[in-house]
UniProtKB/Swiss-Prot annotation:
Active-site residues, record numbering mapped to chain: 299
Amino acid composition bias (Acidic residues), ranges on this chain: 18-27
Gene3D superfamilies assigned: 1.20.120.1750, Zinc/RING finger domain, C3HC4 (zinc finger), Zn-finger domain of Sec23/24
This protein's name: Probable E3 ubiquitin-protein ligase ARI8
Amino acid sequence: MEADDDFYSGTENYSDYADSDEDDADGEYEFVDDAADDSDDLIFRRRQQNYSVLSEADICKLQEDDISRISTVLSISRNSSAILLRHYNWCVSRVHDEWFADEEKVRDAVGLLEKPVVDFPTDGELDCGICFETFLSDKLHAAACGHPFCDSCWEGYITTAINDGPGCLTLRCPDPSCRAAVGQDMINLLAPDKDKQKYTSYFVRSYVEDNRKTKWCPAPGCDYAVNFVVGSGNYDVNCRCCYSFCWNCAEEAHRPVDCDTVSKWVLKNSAESENMNWILANSKPCPKCKRPIEKNQGCMHITCTPPCKFEFCWLCLGAWTEHGEKTGGFYACNRYEAAKQDGIYDETEKRREMAKNSLERYTHYYERWATNQSSRQKALLDLKKMQTDDIEKLSDIQCQPESQLKFIIEAWLQIVECRRVLKWTYAYGFYIPDQEHGKRVFFEYLQGEAESGLERLHQCAEKELLPYLDAKGPSEDFNEFRTKLAGLTSVTKNYFENLVRALENGLSDVNSHDAYDRTSSSKSLGGKTKGSSSKASSSDSSHWPCEYCTYVNPRSTTICQMCEHGR
């Protein structure tokens, strides 16, 4: 079974994929117009229907829209509207429900008074309620309650609250017996400029941190937030900073693996369990002090490190003073061999062998997981370089507008995405139960095909593009390269999307035993025949197995749902 034949047939027409890919391009990618943020160098980003990425300006606009809506509907000031929305976590519908159900209760809860508690005269002299000094009325201010305090005391009170953190957003009157709210209008009037900025920052952040539909991007240094349609199924989010993460668990994006598996895998990578496995597999405890010792030389004579300094035989762990010619020499131990034949060391050796096998298995999956991660990071750097430097250079050399070269950016975006998916398939494979051997074999087959296809795309985008970047002028075969790369991008994208769906469904639609039998037989025979396919399909009238990838499809379909080859 040739990998090329499995990923796409020898008669595949790349131009068909290129045409369809260009037709779909406007639906999948859009230009990012971010003139307000010069640090955002992305040319394209994927358009997702279940979330939107928000800058600080976007958040402020959403806040203003919500405040205006509440102010209009409830006929209250914008300042009071902001206090209400903050109290109800920026949920407009909840504000409406609570307000119209019991306005008096809501006012009492948030500190919105209908009339002052005390009269505040506009002229004359008054005593400050904090420092008890006497001031002219124009040197004192009060919240809606009317309790007067001098400007200096207000400033100290507000500054202390702001320096204490976001709790300043629920600031109340300094009078201990009063619960009147102190809104942003008072902050802007009385606080120093630096405190105003800090308060505004807390206010903007509250829209994200108190809103269950909005989260900050977890990437270090990123100031974007994401507004998500909860319940949309796919939790993967791509921020404008190029970081992809899972909305549900806030780890990096990890489809097709679920959040629980990711949690276990990340914990396993950082836990001491694999250290213990390595110790069990590669060391033995000193018979005296029990410290683990790794044997790094050929002699069986082991001396423990100070202060223990116990000398013992590596094979039987007996004292070295009891060894010599009578035990078979210094490089053998007939005492150990005899004990092993009697079964004394069976359990210890079995435990060590199990630890070694477990470690080797984990290492196999982890190394490939980490390799794809590093490949993805390199692809991200190549993508950025392509966007900032190479596209403009290629446009000049090939005399084509940059808009006609976006197929290259799309190829690199697909490579980055596929590297991420492929990375997490190794975590998926690690947790496939041992008893599901057929499913494991079929999974490894699909994974191998995915790797093969991705390598072809990566090779084309990375290596085959170089001659066109180094050319002195327009290349006659550049359009052929465009067709090939666009075709590879489309085919790879389709395969990986189908792979993700299949793995997320737990390969539930796949007849594992049939997949294993067909894969094994095709490998042994060096190919596949239509006769074997008809036999397999005749055993189940409601499904048919694909000759290329062995996926079992419903009888009603004529194209394989996994690899998209015809029936």
